[in-house]
């Protein structure tokens, strides 16, 4: 009897490509999701046993191996669609009760479970190993820690995707007709039967309905524009069709460490001590070896790891306490992990971390030096960085072509110089077709013409792998180029690297040659093996004249390289100002093009802090100013995170961006600036109207964040950020509240925020106020003093003072936020009733948007949702919130109900003790509680003799 009804494959499961995949882009690329719609059976000619048919979200439908021929083409991403649920198990991150789909249980922590979405979104400690439960009844499968593993972006029919009717559509013209598109607004379960199995879609005509995406194995939709559904770790997903018990045995047999592996323990002492119990035990001397590199000596029978640190010292460790250090050598191709927080944690003492390293995350590089302590110097693009080996993963050799194209360009140029040296060293006495390339290199036009007359069919002959046209184009021998073209040289002939003559002209900075080649039909948009156009080559070399020539000849400036970067992406990175100006003026440039990291050109400019690019892009595409990446980050978020203050000013003042825009974690730019301790940016954002009381996903305000990170930002305020830090510190010191207390960055920012109106009693989702996060009583009092100062200033200020002292709330056109406090007391339209009236001023948000009558019942500002603490009229008197007739009626009704309740209570309460209820009734009709009645002979109310006691139940 099968104890687990979900243990086998079922239609409806959601899958991604697996380890044995060999079917190219049938799934539309790695990371795309499909649905199992048919299970193979014995005797079927098209879908035999141990195969399944998958309907991919983007339309393809094909069968795949799930054990057939011993191969497994697919991985199971989600089985919530077939009803898998873990009753009474709560995800300790998102708090959802009854985890749907696979369950992930931490091996290090007591009773800690995650759902698939939280597990794949890097919740909890990445250095902890987990167990995977495919169903509520299956045996657990141990998986390695997520640390250092590559995450793959999940793509398909998810929230935000554009869809049309799909293969199982049976809903008539609900979509508005064949070919009409809709947008997915939500992925949900079908009642209590299944999870994440249907999609709510809003069609172009405005109607919204729910459609199957795996429910009962049906797929009603086809994705035309994919959306991101999160991430997944390929190594941690089960192979579809492989029995869980075999996968469990595989995970047990495949120990994460082998003899000779280089390892480190990177855990805190307290965590390590706790983990060591039952795994070799704890010895205080082990603390000395935390962070040191050791070598795996052997694996014990229990699976623990014996590590040798020097010739004499060996310790036994819990396997989950160790991190394997990849062994790399000069020339190895590596990938930098894409988790910024993990990299920041590993880099101290190993090259350190700088915000300029952020673009390397997830990118591929080459090891150019190995240091004695194991750290690596890695070339990524046109820069090199020192990395902790724990921040790198090995990269497959067959994918080396995806190395940053700028490195390829440099290598190509150096190779060309070598080729030229070889050509020029060859003898030219003999008269043969092979000499054509040599005479072209020597710029001997007469000899080239003579050879072409003798050997007209040899015009494309190669020497050292290059044609005469390619060499002449590189060197700028214009006359030779024209002669070769007149002799019908193949203008788009490629060399071994895929470069054409136009690529060679770009490499050689030959603008005139490029114009001649284009006039003769050279393909300006042809890609070489590194996925680079001639324009990209010219930009990467900084050759302004060639870039200008190619742009004038209408080449496509939007073509990306293998990393999705366009020529303008690279120009921004290299800060080639003239090239940036040229490219941004091209009429058909698309500023919305995203690279593989999801950065459009405005995002990328903000990330790099390129002021010129920001100004140029905003001048032509200001509508992008609040555009978001997949993670919800806007250009202002990126500028705030990376401390690009001048860029932030441009975005706010010239771009008129929304300073309170939130990312997917509900963080505003102000939150990010505080997280990084960027004092100057904090002051800028607050002065430009950032909401100091805005919540993030945890309910934390800016002040919560500043005080939560005060220990991490231990640098004294006056030593931080030069003049900006000193300026803020001086302002705070001038208040007289600080005394001799030394402020670090976090507490100084908190004081500043309190002075600017931040609510010091605001409770987050854990019920903690900012003051609850402070252990130093002196700091608590200082922050209270600054907060009190703000309140006193607001109360004492008159109408004109209020108007003058308001922070400028930055707004965007065509929204109701253009309403502002007028310095002249003239009637203004109320946002609620539309009557002309003198508007009421709200505190602390400073908005004036409604009249006195409409303001009386408001508890929160309808514009910013901040709780109103005070409402002032134009004459600075406070609005009296007198009760309306409706509230008076409600109060009267409440009083009447209270009177009735008291009367009912009196009827059933014992008249003697007035505590207990009447449970015994006498023949006269009165009564008492049982305890009081025992001593009674006459009724205490009517004085009649008690002859009978009747028990009642109230």
UniProtKB/Swiss-Prot annotation:
<dbReference type="InterPro" id="IPR010606">
    <property type="entry name" value="Mib_Herc2"/>
</dbReference>
<feature type="binding site">
    <location>
        <position position="106"/>
    </location>
    <ligand>
        <name>Zn(2+) 2</name>
    </ligand>
</feature>
<dbReference type="InterPro" id="IPR042056">
    <property type="entry name" value="MIB1/2_ZZ"/>
</dbReference>
<dbReference type="Pfam" id="PF12796">
    <property type="entry name" value="Ank_2"/>
</dbReference>
<dbReference type="InterPro" id="IPR001841">
    <property type="entry name" value="Znf_RING"/>
</dbReference>
<dbReference type="InterPro" id="IPR043145">
    <property type="entry name" value="Znf_ZZ_sf"/>
</dbReference>
<feature type="repeat" description="ANK 9">
    <location>
        <begin position="766"/>
        <end position="795"/>
    </location>
</feature>
<feature type="binding site">
    <location>
        <position position="118"/>
    </location>
    <ligand>
        <name>Zn(2+) 1</name>
    </ligand>
</feature>
<feature type="binding site">
    <location>
        <position position="91"/>
    </location>
    <ligand>
        <name>Zn(2+) 1</name>
    </ligand>
</feature>
<protein>
    <recommendedName>
        <fullName>E3 ubiquitin-protein ligase MIB2</fullName>
        <ecNumber>2.3.2.27</ecNumber>
    </recommendedName>
</protein>
<dbReference type="Pfam" id="PF13857">
    <property type="entry name" value="Ank_5"/>
</dbReference>
<feature type="repeat" description="ANK 3">
    <location>
        <begin position="530"/>
        <end position="559"/>
    </location>
</feature>
<feature type="repeat" description="ANK 6">
    <location>
        <begin position="631"/>
        <end position="661"/>
    </location>
</feature>
<dbReference type="Pfam" id="PF00023">
    <property type="entry name" value="Ank"/>
</dbReference>
<feature type="repeat" description="ANK 4">
    <location>
        <begin position="563"/>
        <end position="591"/>
    </location>
</feature>
<feature type="repeat" description="ANK 5">
    <location>
        <begin position="597"/>
        <end position="626"/>
    </location>
</feature>
<dbReference type="GO" id="GO:0061630">
    <property type="term" value="F:ubiquitin protein ligase activity"/>
</dbReference>
<feature type="zinc finger region" description="ZZ-type">
    <location>
        <begin position="86"/>
        <end position="138"/>
    </location>
</feature>
<keyword id="KW-0040">ANK repeat</keyword>
<keyword id="KW-0677">Repeat</keyword>
<dbReference type="InterPro" id="IPR036770">
    <property type="entry name" value="Ankyrin_rpt-contain_sf"/>
</dbReference>
<dbReference type="InterPro" id="IPR040847">
    <property type="entry name" value="SH3_15"/>
</dbReference>
<dbReference type="GO" id="GO:0016567">
    <property type="term" value="P:protein ubiquitination"/>
</dbReference>
<keyword id="KW-0863">Zinc-finger</keyword>
<keyword id="KW-0862">Zinc</keyword>
<dbReference type="InterPro" id="IPR002110">
    <property type="entry name" value="Ankyrin_rpt"/>
</dbReference>
<keyword id="KW-0808">Transferase</keyword>
<dbReference type="Pfam" id="PF13920">
    <property type="entry name" value="zf-C3HC4_3"/>
</dbReference>
<feature type="domain" description="MIB/HERC2 1">
    <location>
        <begin position="1"/>
        <end position="80"/>
    </location>
</feature>
<keyword id="KW-0963">Cytoplasm</keyword>
<comment type="pathway">
    <text>Protein modification; protein ubiquitination.</text>
</comment>
<feature type="repeat" description="ANK 8">
    <location>
        <begin position="698"/>
        <end position="726"/>
    </location>
</feature>
<feature type="binding site">
    <location>
        <position position="124"/>
    </location>
    <ligand>
        <name>Zn(2+) 2</name>
    </ligand>
</feature>
<feature type="binding site">
    <location>
        <position position="94"/>
    </location>
    <ligand>
        <name>Zn(2+) 1</name>
    </ligand>
</feature>
<dbReference type="Pfam" id="PF06701">
    <property type="entry name" value="MIB_HERC2"/>
</dbReference>
<keyword id="KW-0914">Notch signaling pathway</keyword>
<dbReference type="GO" id="GO:0005737">
    <property type="term" value="C:cytoplasm"/>
</dbReference>
<keyword id="KW-0833">Ubl conjugation pathway</keyword>
<dbReference type="GO" id="GO:0008270">
    <property type="term" value="F:zinc ion binding"/>
</dbReference>
<comment type="function">
    <text>E3 ubiquitin-protein ligase that mediates ubiquitination of Delta receptors, which act as ligands of Notch proteins. Positively regulates the Delta-mediated Notch signaling by ubiquitinating the intracellular domain of Delta, leading to endocytosis of Delta receptors.</text>
</comment>
<feature type="repeat" description="ANK 1">
    <location>
        <begin position="464"/>
        <end position="493"/>
    </location>
</feature>
<feature type="binding site">
    <location>
        <position position="128"/>
    </location>
    <ligand>
        <name>Zn(2+) 2</name>
    </ligand>
</feature>
């Amino acid at each position: 009897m099968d104890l687990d009804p979900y243990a086998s494959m079922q239609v409806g499961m959601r899958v991604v490509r697996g380890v044995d995949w060999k079917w190219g882009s049938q799934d539309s690329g790695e990371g795309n999701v499909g649905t199992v719609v048919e299970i193979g059976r014995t005797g079927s000619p098209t879908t035999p046993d141990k195969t399944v048919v998958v309907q991919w979200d983007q339309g393809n439908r094909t069968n795949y191996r799930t054990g057939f021929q011993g191969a497994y083409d697919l991985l199971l991403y989600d089985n919530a669609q077939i009803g898998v649920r873990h009753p009474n198990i709560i995800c300790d991150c998102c708090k959802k009760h009854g985890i749907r789909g696979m369950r992930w249980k931490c091996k290090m922590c007591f009773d800690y479970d995650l759902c698939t979405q939280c597990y794949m979104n890097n919740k909890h400690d990445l250095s902890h190993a987990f167990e995977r439960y495919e169903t509520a009844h299956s045996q657990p499968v141990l998986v390695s820690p997520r640390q250092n593993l590559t995450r793959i972006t999940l793509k398909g029919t998810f929230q935000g995707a554009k869809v049309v009717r799909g293969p199982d559509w049976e809903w008539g013209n609900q979509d508005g007709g064949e070919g009409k598109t809709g947008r997915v607004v939500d992925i949900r379960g079908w009642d209590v039967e299944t999870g994440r199995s249907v999609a709510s879609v809003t069609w172009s005509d405005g109607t919204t309905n729910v459609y199957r995406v795996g429910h009962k194995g049906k797929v009603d939709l086809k994705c035309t524009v994919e959306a991101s559904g999160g991430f997944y770790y390929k190594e941690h997903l089960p192979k579809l069709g492989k029995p869980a018990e075999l996968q469990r045995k595989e995970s047990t047999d495949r120990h994460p460490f082998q003899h000779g592996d280089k390892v480190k323990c990177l855990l805190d002492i307290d965590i390590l001590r706790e983990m060591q119990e039952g795994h070799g035990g704890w010895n205080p001397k082990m603390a000395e070896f935390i962070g040191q590199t050791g070598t795996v000596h052997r694996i014990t029978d229990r699976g623990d790891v014996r590590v040798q640190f020097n010739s004499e010292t060996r310790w036994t460790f819990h396997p989950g306490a160790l991190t394997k250090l990849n062994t790399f050598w000069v020339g190895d191709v590596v990938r930098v992990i894409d988790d910024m927080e993990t990299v920041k944690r590993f880099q101290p003492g190993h090259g350190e971390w700088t915000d300029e390293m952020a673009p390397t995350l997830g990118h591929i590089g080459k090891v150019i030096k190995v240091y004695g302590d194991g750290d690596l110097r890695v070339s990524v693009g046109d820069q090199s960085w020192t990395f902790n080996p724990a921040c790198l993963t090995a990269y497959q050799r067959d994918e080396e072509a995806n190395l940053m194209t700028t490195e390829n360009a440099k290598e190509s140029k150096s190779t060309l110089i070598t080729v030229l040296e070889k050509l020029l060293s060859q003898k030219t006495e003999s008269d043969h077709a092979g000499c054509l390339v040599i005479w072209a290199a020597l710029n001997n036009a007469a000899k080239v013409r003579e050879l072409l007359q003798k050997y007209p069919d040899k015009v494309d002959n190669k020497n050292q792998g290059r044609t005469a046209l390619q060499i002449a184009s590189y060197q700028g021998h214009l006359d030779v180029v024209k002669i070769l073209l007149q002799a019908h040289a193949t203008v788009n002939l490629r060399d071994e690297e895929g470069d054409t003559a136009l690529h060679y002209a770009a490499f050689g900075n030959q603008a005139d040659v490029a114009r001649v080649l284009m006039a003769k039909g050279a393909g300006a948009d042809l890609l070489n093996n590194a996925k680079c156009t001639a324009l990209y080559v010219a930009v990467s070399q900084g050759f302004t004249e060639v870039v200008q020539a190619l742009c004038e000849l209408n080449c496509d400036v939007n073509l990306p390289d293998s990393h999705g970067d366009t020529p303008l992406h690279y120009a921004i990175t290299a800060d080639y100002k003239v090239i940036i100006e040229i490219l941004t003026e091209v009429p058909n440039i698309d500023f919305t093009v995203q690279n593989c990291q999801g950065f459009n050109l405005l995002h990328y400019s903000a990330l790099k802090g390129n002021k010129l690019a920001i100004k140029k892009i905003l001048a032509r595409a200001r509508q992008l100013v609040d555009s978001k990446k997949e993670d919800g980050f806007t250009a202002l978020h990126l500028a705030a995170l990376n401390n690009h203050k001048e860029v932030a000013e441009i975005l706010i003042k010239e771009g008129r961006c929304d300073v309170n825009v939130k990312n997917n974690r509900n963080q505003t730019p102000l939150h990010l600036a505080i997280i990084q301790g960027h004092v100057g940016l904090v002051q800028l954002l607050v002065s430009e109207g950032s909401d100091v009381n805005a919540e993030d996903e945890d309910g934390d305000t800016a002040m919560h964040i500043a005080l939560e990170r005060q220990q991490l930002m231990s640098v004294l305020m006056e030593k931080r950020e030069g003049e900006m830090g000193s300026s803020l510190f001086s302002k705070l010191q001038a208040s007289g509240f600080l005394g001799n207390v030394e402020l670090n960055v976090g507490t100084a920012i908190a004081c500043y925020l309190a002075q600017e109106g931040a609510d010091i009693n605001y409770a987050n989702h854990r019920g903690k106020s900012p003051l609850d996060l402070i252990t130093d009583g002196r700091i608590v009092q200082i922050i209270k003093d600054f907060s009190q100062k703000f309140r006193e200033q607001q109360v004492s200020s008159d109408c004109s003072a209020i108007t003058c002292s308001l922070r400028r709330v930055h707004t965007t056109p065509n929204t109701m936020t253009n309403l502002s406090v007028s310095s002249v007391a003239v009637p203004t339209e109320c946002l609620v009733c539309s009557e002309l009236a003198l508007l009421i001023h709200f505190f602390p948000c400073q908005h004036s948007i409604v009249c006195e009558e409409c303001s009386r019942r408001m508890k929160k500002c309808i514009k910013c949702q901040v709780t109103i603490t005070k409402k002032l009229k134009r004459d600075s008197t406070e609005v009296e919130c007198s009760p309306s007739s409706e509230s008076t009626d409600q109060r009267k009704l409440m009083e009447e109900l209270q009177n009735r309740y008291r009367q009912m209570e009196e009827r059933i309460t014992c008249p003697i003790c007035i505590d207990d209820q009447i449970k015994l009734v006498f023949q006269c009709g009165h009564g008492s509680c049982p305890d009081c009645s025992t001593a009674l002979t006459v009724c205490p109310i009517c004085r009649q003799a008690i002859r009978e006691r009747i028990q009642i139940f109230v």
